[in-house]
């Protein structure tokens, strides 16, 4: 696990069958809970639901609300000691929950990729992470369309459908990499640079941040950039990437100022499948923002 400050194990952490605040068995139980709920609450409504707009202009559907309500109930019944912060809660409630997060807090995005879901595009997922002591302790990202369950425990590894997930393929140079880049949240000068002088082989953007991280962890893409992710977007997926051996994280700017603690405010995500590739990728971004790329 590399270069994710808020995911690192404390010096006094002891792993003895239980990794952090969740055991492997509990993680598998969480995966089953999420998969069952996603099948019943999301897939049953896919292609059959209408969307409305929230105050910030983003979309929301009945599926978002029903999935969140169900997981709130099930998490409270199974792990009553941990509160739940959901994307569809109000800002004041979210801030209050963050203030008490050190003792354990679930961070939930019940439907990541709502615009895709509402448009009939089969690329969306569920993201849930357990925070404690200022770090992500464990997480699950579930893709109900492909039935892929990505999971990770801090200091314990990452898995895809229960099989160990490790980045072990040869990393290409940046020019040969496939990029996952969300252009709409980037500064205009950076978008212009991508349009006129892109540094990679090709680029995609699929519309589900949590799955973006996991596709990077499974080496389907090799470099990643997103200009504004919130806590529920990246908490679980970034842990999957870190535990799989990827490199990168959350940043305050394009000059490499790393985010050192989990917060609700949007942050820049920059990552890659290897240290060498990450250094080349982040270096190109810094140079591009300075007009040198």
Language-model features: where?
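N-terminal subdomain of lithium-sensitive/metallo-dependent phosphomonoesterases centered on the IMPase/IPPase/PAP
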Residues: 2-111, 290-293
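Glycine-rich active-site/cofactor-binding loop and its immediate structural neighborhood
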Residues: 104-141
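Residue-level signal for inorganic ion chemistry
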Residues: 42, 64, 75, 114, ...
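Oxyanion/phosphate-interacting regions
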Residues: 2-32, 194-197, 214-293
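Acidic beta-strand-loop-alpha-helix segment within the catalytic core
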Residues: 128-214, 220, 260-293
């Amino acid at each position: 696990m590399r270069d994710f400050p808020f995911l690192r194990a404390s010096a006094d952490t002891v792993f003895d069958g239980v990794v952090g605040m969740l055991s492997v068995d509990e993680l598998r139980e969480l995966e089953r809970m999420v998969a069952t709920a996603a099948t019943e609450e999301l897939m049953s409504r896919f292609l059959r639901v209408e969307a409305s707009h929230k105050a910030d202009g983003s979309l929301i559907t009945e599926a978002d609300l029903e999935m969140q309500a169900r997981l709130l109930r099930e998490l409270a019944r199974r792990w009553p000691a941990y509160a739940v912060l959901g994307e569809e809660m109000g800002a004041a409630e979210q801030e209050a929950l963050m203030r008490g997060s050190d003792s354990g807090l679930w961070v939930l995005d019940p439907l990541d990729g709502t615009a895709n879901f509402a448009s009939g595009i089969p690329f969306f997922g569920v993201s849930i992470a357990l925070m404690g002591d200022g770090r992500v302790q464990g997480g699950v990202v579930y893709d109900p369309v492909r039935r892929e369950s990505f999971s990770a425990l801090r200091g314990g590894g990452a898995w895809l459908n229960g099989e160990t997930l490790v980045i072990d393929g040869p990393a290409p140079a940046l020019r040969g990499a496939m990029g996952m880049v969300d252009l709409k949240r980037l500064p205009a000068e950076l978008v212009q640079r991508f349009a006129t002088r892109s540094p990679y082989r090709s680029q995609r953007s699929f519309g589900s941040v949590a799955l973006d991280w996991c596709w990077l962890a499974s080496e389907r893409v090799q470099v990643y950039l997103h200009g504004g992710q919130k806590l529920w977007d990246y908490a679980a997926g970034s842990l999957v990437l870190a535990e799989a051996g990827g490199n990168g994280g959350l940043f305050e700017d394009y000059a490499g100022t790393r985010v050192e603690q989990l917060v609700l405010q949007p942050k820049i995500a920059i990552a890659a499948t290897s240290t060498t590739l990450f250094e080349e990728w982040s270096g190109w971004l810094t140079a591009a923002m300075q007009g040198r790329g």
